[in-house]
Amino acid sequence: GLLGSIFGAGKKIACALSGLC
């Protein structure tokens, strides 16, 4: 759903910013 999509995007952004990808 929309909420899951937003949460998934947030996790990707946090991953990229933290460099833990």
Curated annotation (Swiss-Prot):
Organism domain of life: Eukaryota
GO terms under cellular component: extracellular region
InterPro entries registered for this protein in UniProt: Nigrocin
Keyword entries, A-Z: Amphibian defense peptide, Antibiotic, Antimicrobial, Disulfide bond, Secreted
Residue pairs linked by disulfide bridges in the UniProt entry: 15-21
Chief place of localization: secreted
Tissue: Expressed by the skin glands.
Entry annotated with the keyword Disulfide bond: yes
Function statement: Has antibacterial activity against the Gram-positive bacterium S.aureus ATCC 25923 (MIC=28 uM) and the Gram-negative bacterium E.coli ATCC 25726 (MIC=14 uM).
UniProt record similarity statement: Belongs to the frog skin active peptide (FSAP) family. Brevinin subfamily.
Designated name of the protein: Nigrocin-2HSb
